[in-house]
Amino acid sequence: MSEISDAEKVRIASDFIKHAPPGEFNEVFNSVRMLLENDDLLKNKCVNAIAQYNVGQFVPVKLDGVAKQTLITPYNDLGNGRFYDEVSKKSFKYDHVRKEAADLQPHPAESGITEQWRQALQTQLDIYIDDHYAKSGTGVVFARNGVFTICIESHQFQPKNFCNGRWRSEWNVPVGDGKSGSQEMKGKILSQVHYYEDGNVQLFSEKEPVLKVNVSADFDKTAKEIIHAISEEETIYQNAVQENYANMSDTTFKALRRQLPVTRAKMDWNKAQTYRIGQEMK
């Protein structure tokens, strides 16, 4: 890349970083480092791309002395590299390259009814995560300026099996504004999987559902209804992805199979649907 300007090098390197598959950031980062051959340029000019990647992927992080992980998201970003954990009420400095938290400091909770709503939602979300996500799930309810957002992340990284994947979802929860009755709840669900044994199959799926939920002054009852609605919608989405993938096995993958013997790929396309790409994350 010696004939390319530094600005163009940064643009190309940043694009590679921001599109790294789940669980493969280190491999992409090291490859970019070799291409740039300039650690100062990588450290000083590509750090924004690394931060965007971590925030966009809802990367989980463990805080010292805190039982459960929290997430790196736009909804708990305090700026200047600091984030906060809603459960422990601590803010921390996050190293986007090392993916480590440091300098924990007390962080004030939202006051009064806002924190009551947040705790009720977090209690029900914890139950849902424990019941439906395979060990690696993390769910956090963020409350900021009276606005509630539920973020969920789950991943399965299996490099020995040449397969990595991540599930993310976020939900804007319509509580805390004094309104009751049927309210609109908007969400976004994303799943991304990379299978790469003697071939390269990437699954990226996104859906932005809009649900109706009943909101009342009863914190616990409303929280249960909201998490139940999320559970139903995420199950519908998961089943639809699996069904579409099974259909692709009989259409798209069969068309590809005629060309694959030239590459001597080992993947059995007839059994593609049995690989359960995306399913093991939830």
From Swiss-Prot:
Biological process (GO) annotations held by this record are:
actin cytoskeleton organization; barbed-end actin filament capping
Give the disulfide map.
none
Localization per record: Cytoplasm, Cytoskeleton
**SUPFAM superfamilies, alphabetized:** Subunits of heterodimeric actin filament capping protein Capz (SSF90096)
For this UniProt entry, the molecular function terms from Gene Ontology, in alphabetical order, are:
actin filament binding
- Which keywords appear in this protein's UniProt record, sorted alphabetically? Actin capping, Actin-binding, Cytoplasm, Cytoskeleton
Q: Name one GO cellular component term.
A: dynactin complex
Q: Which domain of life is it from?
A: Eukaryota
The protein's role, per its UniProt record = F-actin-capping proteins bind in a Ca(2+)-independent manner to the fast growing ends of actin filaments (barbed end) thereby blocking the exchange of subunits at these ends. Unlike other capping proteins (such as gelsolin and severin), these proteins do not sever actin filaments.
| Protein name, entry field | F-actin-capping protein subunit alpha
Q: What is the native source organism of this protein? A: Caenorhabditis elegans
